[in-house]
């Protein structure tokens, strides 16, 4: 959804760098396929995911971040105790650079347990990025 239906080969790192700063290996995005979904439907889902992090949404606390965020809260039923809470987000919503997923076992609602953790991670990621560009 975040990449307009395009599915890329996942990488945990973008490049490997030697101690001297030279690049050993650079990983480029590799398109693996795409979803058979119309752009109209993708736009609808993306809009709904952005609304989750706006006023009135279940993760509206993320609206205070310096970038727009799209996300989805969730609760997974647990027959052995309190439900598990989860939240997934990508940011910036218009041109995603990061995806963060958090599940809190027995955390109840994702909006209460997992979303604040994701917010903290995104604050860190974008604060560090702003330092790098002198903002």
Where are these regions (language model features)?
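Extended C-terminal subregions enriched in glycine
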Residues: 36-50
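Active-site beta-strand/loop architecture of penicillin-binding DD-peptidases
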Residues: 1-32, 49-134
């Amino acid at each position: 959804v975040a990449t307009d239906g395009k599915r890329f080969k996942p990488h945990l790192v973008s490049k490997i760098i030697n101690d001297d700063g030279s690049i050993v290996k650079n990983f480029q995005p590799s398109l693996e396929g795409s979803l058979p979904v119309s752009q109209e439907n993708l736009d609808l889902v993306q809009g709904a995911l952005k609304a989750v992090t706006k006023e009135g949404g279940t993760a509206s606390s993320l609206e205070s971040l310096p970038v727009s965020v799209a996300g989805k809260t969730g609760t997974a039923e647990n027959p052995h105790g309190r439900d598990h809470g989860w939240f997934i987000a990508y940011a910036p919503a218009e041109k995603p650079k990061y995806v963060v997923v958090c599940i809190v076992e027995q955390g109840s609602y994702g909006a209460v347990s997992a979303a604040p953790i994701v917010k903290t991670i995104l604050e860190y990621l974008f604060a560090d990025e702003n330092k790098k560009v002198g903002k």
